[in-house]
Design a protein with these regions (language model features):
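A short coil-to-beta-strand element that immediately follows conserved catalytic motifs
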Residues: 207, 303-315, 378
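General small-molecule cofactor/ligand-binding pocket signal
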Residues: 138-140, 309-312, 344
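C-terminal lid/capping helical subdomain adjacent to the catalytic/cofactor pocket in oxidative enzymes
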Residues: 314-317, 324-395
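Active-site/ligand-binding neighborhood in enzyme catalytic cores
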Residues: 19-151, 170
Length: 395
């Protein structure tokens, strides 16, 4: 579950035998470090082999469709960072002596309170759009970039496909948050074969989410946290079970009460599935997939399917840039893109890096600073590259 917590309930659910095995497994991992040639070894070094098998292996394989043994440790370095079993335990021991509102020097995976927009993150971008338009800017929606025009080591414009035909836009500076695979393919320049091949083969995982409005959850709140209608306090729950394909469950009531119309009598949840465009899950009809998702949650005891009041399904392409396949040669692609003096790659897909929203925003800020002379191009790429940045907040 998230926020991550270690408690008597956690140990009770694991059982005495598993807890002892986890403890000895962690001590072994501390004494005999593995070379971090894969995500598997990265996890084992921080949590021990028993906890890796219990909590990380199956979920990670659901997420990426590939066993962690074949995934670069870079993903762990960006997402898990300094978090380990010892730090999780230390956080529990320090908790009585730390104010609940003080998140300084705390691993963010362990933070229990954080700022969240009243009506969800989309509200932030609605506000940004309003500010852009107030300042005289314009935002073109539903336009697919077909061609990136280049000349003399610079990007000169883009050609888009829009509802009423093709249009061309020119500019002085270009910020790209489109998937690098698509960016390189759209360039009208003679891209080196090795770069073009690497970019074309960059792997991604696609994403399906199902929103369910239900009368209640069957799982109970066994914590001391008070919640409306006493629902479980988790923001999301990771699902490790092999016999279901759901990877994660979000409980929107706990993100913000303003996102649920009838907070006291309904629960708004989001089921998350990781897949590949064109596979069996992706190709299912909305109605069939919603029934499939309801059945999975009922199977693992989260809901009674009869309690579902409403449902919606959303598919997202290239939601997760992946760290296997041609990713090993990604530095060659980066070096090529950096030869365009007025092009800055920003965001998660724009850098083929599993950034969170805050880091994606920061890449844009760093790009603007680089243009204004208060920084350099490397600063943009180096966001979330420092090992301690992502999961530890010092201020």
């Amino acid at each position: 579950a998230y926020p991550i917590s270690i408690s008597g309930e956690t140990i009770k659910n694991m059982g005495f035998g598993n807890t002892v095995r986890a403890g000895f497994g962690y001590m072994k991992s501390v004494l005999f470090k593995k070379k971090e040639t894969s995500l598997k070894n990265f996890y084992i070094n921080r949590f021990g082999a028993p906890l890796y098998r219990m909590f990380f292996e199956d979920y990670t394989e659901k997420l990426w469709g590939v066993n962690p043994e074949f995934i670069s440790a870079d993903w762990g370095a960006q997402r898990v960072k300094g978090l380990s079993l010892s730090k999780a335990v230390l956080s529990v021991l320090k908790k009585p002596f730390v104010r609940s509102t003080d998140s300084k020097k705390v691993e963010t995976s362990l933070i229990e309170q954080f700022i969240y927009p009243k009506k969800g993150p989309g509200q932030l971008w609605e506000t940004v759009a309003e500010e852009i338009e107030k300042l005289g800017g314009s935002i073109v929606m539903n336009a697919k970039v077909k061609t990136v025009k280049t000349s003399g080591g610079a990007v000169t414009g883009v050609v888009t496909q829009e509802k009423d035909g093709e249009k061309e836009y020119s500019g002085d500076w270009f910020f790209s948050s489109m998937p690098i695979k698509d960016l390189v393919a759209a360039m009208d320049a003679e891209v080196p074969k090795e770069v073009a091949h690497t970019a074309a083969e960059l792997p991604y995982r696609d994403f399906i989410t199902v929103g369910l409005l239900v009368d209640k959850l069957l799982i109970k709140n066994r914590t001391k946290m008070k919640t409306v209608s006493d629902i479980v306090p988790d923001c999301w729950i990771y699902v490790q079970e092999r016999d279901v394909r759901i990877g994660r469950l979000q409980i929107f009531n706990n993100w913000s009460p303003y996102m649920v119309n009838d907070l006291e009598n309904t629960v708004w949840i989001g089921l998350e599935y990781f897949c590949n465009e064109g596979d069996d899950m992706w190709n299912m009809s909305d109605a069939d997939f919603i029934e499939f998702a309801k059945g999975e949650l009922e199977h693992i005891g989260i809901i009674d399917a009869a309690d579902v009041r409403d449902a919606v399904r959303v598919k997202v392409k290239k939601a997760y840039p992946a760290y296997f396949g041609s990713y090993a040669d990604f530095p060659k692609v980066r070096r090529y893109l950096d030869t365009y003096e007025n092009l800055y790659c920003i965001g998660r897909n724009g850098q083929h890096k599993y950034n969170n929203m805050d880091h994606s925003m920061l890449t844009a800020m760093k790009a603007v600073r680089a243009i204004s002379g208060d920084g350099c191009r490397d600063d943009v790429w180096n966001v979330n590259a420092e090992k301690e940045y992502h999961e530890k907040k010092d201020s």
